[in-house]
Amino acid sequence: MASSQLAPEKYTELLNEFISQYPNSADGYLRRANNQIFQSKEASSMDEVAADMDKALEVAQKKDDAYFNRAKLIYGYQLDKPEKTYKDWTYDRALDEVRKAIAIEALPVYIQLEGDIQFAKKDYAAALASYEKVNDSNIASPATFFRAAKTKELMEAAPEEVLALMDSCMARFVQPYSEEAAPYLLERAQMRLNAGQGRGAMLDYDEYYKAVRGNVNDVFYYYREQAAVQAKQFQRALDDLAKAIELNPKELTYFSELAVVNIRVGRNEEAIKVLKDALEIDSKYAEAYRLIGVAQLQLKQNKEACASFAKAKELGDPNVDALIEKHCK
C-alpha cells in the first residue's frame, strides 16, 4: 500500500478497500489515520483519525505497537503546532501512550520516542535519562548520541561532557567521513569552538569540507576563520576571510573581521585598506570608522584615530565611547 505514488484521495480509497477486506488488521487503520491527519486537521477529520487509532488498538495483536504508533502520531501532531489542540492530543497524552507501550515491552525505539517527547516538553533531565538507555541498546547510532549531546548542552552541562557524547557520535562513522557525517561534524566543530578548543574545531571544519567535497558557502569560511583565530592560525584565518568575501562581497561583517585579524598580526595599513573597501559599500558603516581608529592608534596616528572615533560616534557606534575616553581626552 505505497502512498508516495498516489494522490491522497486515491490512497484513501485503497485503504478503505484494504480495511473492508482485512477488518482485523491494525495496519490498515494506522495507515488510514496517518493519511487522514496528513490531509486535514479539522475537528471532524480528527474524530475519524482518533476512531481509527482506537480501532487499531482494539484489533492489534501487539498492543505495545499500537500504543507506540498512537504516541508517535500525537507527538507529530503537536510538533506541527496546531492552532487549537484536538481534545487531549497533547505531549502529555503522547507520553502516556508510549509509556503504556514500554510497560508491555521496553523496546529501545519506544524509549527513544519517550525521550523525544520529553525533549519537546523541555524536560531535559528526563529526556537525557531516556536517551542514555537508548545509547546502551542495540539501536544506538550517531543520531541518538547527538540527541543526548544536544540535551546536555541545553541543560548547560560542562562542555567536556557534551563533547564526550559528540565524540561517541562521531566514533560511529567510518573515516574518511561521508556526507552523512557532515552535519554532525559541523555541530561538533561549533561545540569545540564554544568550548575554546579552536584547533579541534578547525580540524572538524576541515573534515566537513572534505565530506561535502568542498561544496560550502561564505558562512562556512567565516566560522572556520573563527576557529583558526582561536587556534592562532592567523594566515589560515586571513585566507578563509578572503574566500568568504569572494563568495559574498557585500557582507560587511567579513570586512570587519578581516580588519580585526590584520590588526592582531600587526598589518595595520592592510586593515585600514580593507575597512575603506567596506566604506565603499556602505559609507555609514560606523564599525569601520572605529576599527580604522584602532589601526591608526597602532600606527601612532593619534590625531587621525580620534577623528575616526568621532565619526564612528556620529554614526552611532555603541562601542566607541571607551576608546574616546581613553585616547582622545
Predicted regions and their residues:
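Terminal, low-structured helical/coil segments at or just beyond the last alpha-helical repeat
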Residues: 294, 298-329
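Register position in tetratricopeptide repeats
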Residues: 38, 76-77, 120, 151-155, ...
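Structural marker of alpha-solenoid helical repeat scaffolds
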Residues: 21, 59, 103-104, 136-137, ...
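Helix-start (N-cap) detector for alpha-helical repeat units in TPR-like alpha-solenoids
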Residues: 26-27, 63-65, 108-109, 141-143, ...
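N-terminal leader/linker segments that initiate helical-solenoid repeat arrays
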Residues: 1-47, 51, 58, 65, ...
